[in-house]
């Protein structure tokens, strides 16, 4: 039936109005998509398995000019691939070419005259990466057409130029799982005839849609964090080739046209003038091609390259020319636009194909200039690191594992990082070797390092001034994404900018994890302690899963001359089997956790190990509220952090099914961001209250915290602008005496607090509270939106985390002046005891993009430690 259905839809697709490449002859020995998949490039949305099968068929048909590389595998088991296309001579010695490309990328190792030889002989490498959002469908169709054209075209001088002067890397789909979801949903929603109505089922994706991957991540925000396997595989492949041009092909609203750079303001501070000049060269070439074919387009609007986690900006921070291409999306085979025109899937394929081929031709034409720009970028980066700060020192005494993970993540982006092997002297301090990492600044990735580690990346001043004017007039700002992302700030790792080399003995990190070596544990008379932190939390989650009994310290104590903080894990021999040392050693090694054997439990100061303040932990039974009305990203981030980051088993239950759940089967219920008023009525709210009183732990975040406060589950209120409580009536407007303050007179009487566009705000924590276990009392909190909550009163709960005062509030990014007084000293983490249980509320999403490691630790503290309290 499905095959017959597909045939019907193919027949109904309007015939293409233009050939992909008019007048081009193609080699019949190279298969078309129709021969492999049964449809043309522009006639049908090709499923991911058929995309891979077709590229494999192309590589097999032209083995002298193409090689299909498997770069990784998605969470759902689908392969991610990259097709490499070049001349027969170059492909025959591909490994040697790649080695030379990597040599060009590191000017420090080049001998006299070698740079000129490399520039003279090396190809320009252009990477075309497609479909990072699975429902942006035409780009993958274009990817297959691009590959076919480059391998099958005969007598085409432009293709000859491309093969002679360049290597082309084609990643056909960065998000196969999302594409598969879209194809299934779109096919299921189709009628007998194609339906162009925007409201038709085939255009209306059910939650969560195809944009996101299995864990509901936006993979176009993951380039530097690399939390997802799709990203890690792609980045590793690109670092193997060090491409000089990287184009990320997307889709946008069906009522738009086509976007290619030059980009909108603001640009990233670390982009060079020559990179911008070359971006203009590519823009002009695309404009000429589009004008020739009568295609509408725009640029210098909407899409900027400020945030370094995009497919356009991460490559630019490495020295490449990066670009985002956006095509209006039919979100199916045909869409009726608001102007009355019909947009087809085939139109999108044609437009992307045209831009992509124009790009590789332009790169080939300007090969030498592009290679020199790339080399100059990398060489000047090294020189920049020879003045100013010579080394960036990353350290965390309270959580060495946090610093280690940060260092490992930097290495994934090709950044050189060294692990300290001895104490490090810097700035009059001596740092322990454990948890200390050194980033030399005189390396080719200097600009990327500054992008990722500096506390603040400045934004164009004129642009910011215009946004202030817009905000004053109650117009939305034009900031496309967050304004801060400093990894040390979000990971609770101290950054020290050393003005001279520390001289400490170090070990260079590579792409393997540098774990603490606890391959064996000696027998201990009493048991073992595990100082709390990210490594310990992951180790305890596995230990509980494996049936090891663990207790948790509810207060500080001193034992054996060492101080231990709240949350320290206590694993007693008497609670466990005789093979505890072996089992615990294996678990600790996997996670890098420190384990301290103890032969007596006589505490000299602080809480005794047998105190009533020691709680017994059990593996928590966690329910994650799934589906609408949860915000897609928030649901996915929470599930990823639980299941993959910390190894916590989780049951995802759709919000619409909560009424059928026996809450007593669960210890923890997590409500991701969202307004649950429609899904959780009065009856379910009463059940949640009773469940908490019986010992359950409920966790809310961002918009679900606003919902919990509004319905009375949480004893605080969301504020309106100026501090008025949500729900209070504004005062009646009065006519002011003249003269008046015009802006004040026209301000609305009731509005949300000023929006914060993704800034990092200083958060202060009560380190005596178990929710703050593993922290040093101060972290960076990613604040995005208009949420401000009043502090909970002491008789109802504890404000475990609050924002700093106005003068110390902003760590990085933009917080508008009007927002600072209202944010300052307000809570971002509230603990409200409810009978024998808890309601734990975060003002923001602690799992933001899974790269806010410091607040993620607070979240997992709530999950692991809450049920035992």
Per-region residue spans from a language model:
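Carboxylate/His-rich catalytic cores and anion/metal-binding grooves
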Residues: 6, 147-150, 165-188, 192-194
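Aromatic- and acidic-residue-enriched carbohydrate-binding clefts of CAZyme catalytic domains
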Residues: 198-217, 728
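Intrinsic-disorder/low-complexity accessory segments
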Residues: 13-141, 145-169, 215, 221-222, ...
């Amino acid at each position: 039936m499905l095959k017959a259905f597909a045939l019907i839809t193919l027949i109904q697709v309007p015939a293409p109005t233009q050939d992909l490449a008019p007048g081009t002859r193609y080699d019949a020995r190279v298969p078309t998509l129709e021969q492999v998949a049964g449809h043309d490039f522009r006639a049908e949305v090709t499923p991911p398995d058929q995309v891979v099968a077709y590229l494999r068929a192309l590589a097999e048909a032209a083995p002298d000019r193409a090689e299909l590389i498997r770069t990784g595998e998605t969470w759902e088991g689908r392969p991610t691939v990259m097709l490499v296309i070049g001349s027969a001579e170059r492909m025959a010695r591909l490994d040697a070419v790649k080695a030379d490309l990597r040599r060009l990328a590191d000017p420090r190792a080049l001998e006299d005259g070698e740079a000129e030889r490399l520039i003279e002989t090396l190809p320009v490498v252009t990477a075309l990466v497609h479909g990072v959002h699975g429902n942006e469908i035409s780009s993958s169709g274009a990817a297959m057409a691009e590959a076919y054209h480059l391998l099958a075209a005969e007598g085409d001088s432009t293709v000859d130029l491309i093969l002679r002067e360049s290597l082309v890397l084609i990643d056909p789909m960065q998000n196969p799982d999302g594409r598969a979801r879209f194809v299934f949903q779109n096919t299921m929603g189709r009628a007998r005839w194609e339906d162009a109505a925007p409201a038709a089922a085939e255009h209306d994706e059910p939650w969560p849609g195809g944009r996101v991957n299995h864990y509901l991540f936006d993979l176009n925000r993951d380039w530097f964090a690399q939390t997802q396997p799709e990203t890690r595989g792609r980045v590793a492949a690109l670092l193997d080739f060090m491409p000089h041009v990287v184009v990320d092909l997307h889709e946008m609203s069906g009522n738009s046209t086509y976007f290619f750079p030059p980009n909108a303001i603001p640009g990233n501070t670390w982009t060079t003038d020559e990179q911008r000049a070359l971006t203009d060269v590519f823009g002009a070439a695309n404009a000429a091609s589009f004008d020739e074919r009568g295609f509408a387009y725009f640029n210098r609007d909407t899409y900027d390259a400020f945030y370094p986690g995009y497919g356009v900006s991460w490559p630019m921070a490495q020295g490449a020319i990066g670009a985002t291409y956006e095509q209006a999306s039919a979100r199916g085979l045909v869409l009726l636009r608001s102007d009355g025109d019909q947009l087809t899937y085939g139109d999108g394929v044609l437009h992307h194909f045209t831009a992509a081929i124009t790009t590789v031709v332009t790169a080939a034409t300007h090969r030498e200039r592009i290679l020199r720009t790339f080399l100059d970028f990398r060489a000047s980066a090294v020189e920049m690191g020879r003045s100013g700060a010579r080394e960036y020192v990353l350290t965390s005494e309270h959580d060495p594992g946090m610093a280690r993970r940060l260092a490992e993540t930097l290495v994934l982006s090709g950044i050189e990082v060294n692990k300290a092997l001895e104490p490090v002297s810097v700035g009059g301090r001596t740092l322990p070797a454990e948890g200390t990492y050194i980033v030399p600044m005189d390396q080719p990735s200097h600009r990327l390092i500054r992008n990722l580690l500096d506390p603040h990346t400045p934004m164009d001043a004129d642009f910011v001034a215009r946004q202030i004017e817009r905000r004053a007039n109650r117009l939305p700002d034009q900031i496309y994404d967050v304004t801060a992302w400093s990894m040390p700030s979000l990971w609770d790792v101290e950054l020290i900018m050393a003005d001279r080399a520390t001289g400490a003995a170090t070990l260079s990190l590579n792409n393997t994890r540098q774990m603490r070596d606890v391959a064996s544990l000696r027998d201990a008379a009493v048991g073992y302690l595990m100082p709390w932190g990210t490594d310990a939390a992951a180790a305890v989650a596995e230990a509980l899963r494996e049936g090891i009994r663990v207790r948790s310290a509810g207060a500080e104590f001193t034992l054996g001359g060492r101080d231990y903080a709240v949350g320290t894990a206590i694993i007693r021999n008497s609670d466990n089997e005789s093979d505890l040392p072996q089992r615990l050693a294996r678990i600790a090694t996997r996670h890098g956790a420190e384990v301290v054997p103890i032969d007596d439990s006589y505490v000299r100061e602080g809480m005794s190990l047998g105190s009533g303040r020691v709680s017994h932990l059990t593996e928590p039974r966690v329910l994650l509220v799934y589906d609408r009305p949860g915000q897609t990203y928030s649901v996915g981030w929470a599930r990823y952090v639980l299941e993959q980051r910390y190894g916590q088993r989780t049951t995802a239950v759709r919000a619409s099914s909560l009424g059928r759940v026996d809450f007593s089967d669960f210890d923890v219920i997590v409500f991701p961001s969202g307004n649950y008023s429609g899904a959780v009525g009065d009856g379910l709210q009463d059940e949640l209250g009773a469940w908490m009183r019986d010992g359950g732990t409920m966790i809310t975040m961002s918009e679900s915290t606003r919902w919990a406060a509004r319905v009375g589950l949480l004893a605080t209120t969301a504020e309106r602008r100026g501090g008025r409580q949500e729900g209070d009536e504004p005062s009646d407007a009065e006519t002011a005496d003249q003269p008046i303050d015009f802006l004040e007179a026209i301000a609305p009487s009731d509005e949300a607090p000023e929006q914060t566009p993704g800034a990092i705000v200083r958060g202060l924590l009560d380190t005596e509270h178990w929710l703050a276990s593993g922290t040093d009392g101060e972290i960076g909190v990613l604040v995005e939106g208009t949420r401000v909550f009043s502090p909970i009163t002491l008789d109802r709960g504890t404000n475990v985390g609050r924002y700093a005062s106005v003068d110390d509030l902003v760590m990085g990014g933009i917080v508008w002046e009007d927002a600072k007084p209202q944010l300052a000293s307000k809570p971002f983490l509230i603990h409200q005891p409810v009978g024998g249980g808890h309601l734990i509320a975060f003002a923001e999403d602690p799992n933001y993009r899974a790269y806010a490691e410091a607040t993620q630790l607070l979240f997992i503290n709530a999950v692991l430690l809450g049920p035992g309290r």
